[in-house]
């Protein structure tokens, strides 16, 4: 088994090919972590949620962390984003940002999962979705492979096309 630190560029590439992560936020010294779907664009992550604990906590403390990974049988990559929450309010100031977030998210299958599935029994009016951006302030990443995959640089099983990028990334940083 080997593992290697990813460059910022390679870490951002992992984000560009990933849509599910775990968002961590803190309020009153208490951490909270939840799954979120996101879309990466221009050094930011875009997502949405219905009103609730996650939004309340990020409003109180906009410093957040997102962990995202890609795991396969013989190789993996994981990144951690340190960033700042910014709510994209339904105002003229954020109109284009909200449209961008919506367009980026719609490109992903099941993009509304996690953020849009909260139930609100007895609500007279359905909750309004809250779009937000996480501006990336710092990112770290690591990748690795089994000893067999690291030794010969090949996979023992075929790699589906949608996962080819991860194998190429690993081969580019594989030790000699």
Features from the language model and the residues they span:
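Short, basic/aromatic recognition patches
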Residues: 1-22
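Charged, gly/pro-rich active-site loop segments
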Residues: 2, 75-176
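Alpha-helix boundary recognition
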Residues: 15-16, 56-60, 106
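Short beta-strand segments
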Residues: 18-50, 66-67
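Generic structural signal for secondary-structure transition and capping sites
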Residues: 19-20, 63, 110, 139
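Beta-strand-connecting loop/turn residues
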Residues: 43-44, 62, 137
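Short acidic (Asp/Glu) patches
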Residues: 49-52, 61-69, 108-120
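Helix-adjacent hinge/juxtasegments
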Residues: 53-61, 65-82, 86-88
